[in-house]
Amino acid sequence: MARLHSGKRGSSGSTKPLRTEVPEWVSMSAEEVQAKIVEMAKDGNQSAIIGNILRDMYGIPNVKLVTGKSVSSIMKDAGFYSEVPEDLFNLMKKAINLRNHLENNPRDIHSKVGLNLIESKIRRLVKYYKGTKVLPATWRYSPQTARLLVE
């Protein structure tokens, strides 16, 4: 499949191995994993970072196999998940950083094009999240509200 904003083809990637039970070398129990996730969420980490830390430092290949729930659902149950989805939040952060760059460098036309592409992707995601009722129907993206949300 092709890339979204370029004429290039996508690169192939590896797939996760099909596994239905917890590997025997995983030493932590489901309760310990949930407690560790809540502890890392209190420190302000996002779910993707928490998953990477659990994989690299604690040897947990798949949180859903161990606990029966995903990292984001554990964070929602504990009350640490934000009302704006993470991917949308990260794109808004990226757009704000690019706007700050363009204030200092107004003639950087390549960054203007990049900002346009990022904001198009934000609008597509907002449309999707409104359709799936993750965001309210009255929610709108604007650079000013995004700046307030991120900071």
UniProtKB/Swiss-Prot annotation:
GO biological process: translation
Gene3D superfamilies linked: 4.10.860.130, S15/NS1, RNA-binding (1.10.287.10)
GO cellular component, one term: cytosolic small ribosomal subunit
Segment forming the signal sequence: none
UniProt-recorded name of the protein: Small ribosomal subunit protein uS15
Subunit structure: Part of the 30S ribosomal subunit.
Disulfide bonds: none
Annotated CDD domains: Ribosomal_S15p_S13e (cd00353)
Gene for this chain: rps15
Sequence similarity: Belongs to the universal ribosomal protein uS15 family.
Species this protein is from: Methanococcus vannielii (strain ATCC 35089 / DSM 1224 / JCM 13029 / OCM 148 / SB)
Keywords, alphabetical: Ribonucleoprotein, Ribosomal protein
Any one Pfam family match given in the protein's UniProt record, by short name: Ribosomal_S15
Any one GO molecular function term: small ribosomal subunit rRNA binding
SMART domains the record matches: Ribosomal_S13_N, Ribosomal_S15
Keyword Nucleotide-binding tagged: no
Chain segments carrying region Disordered: 1-20
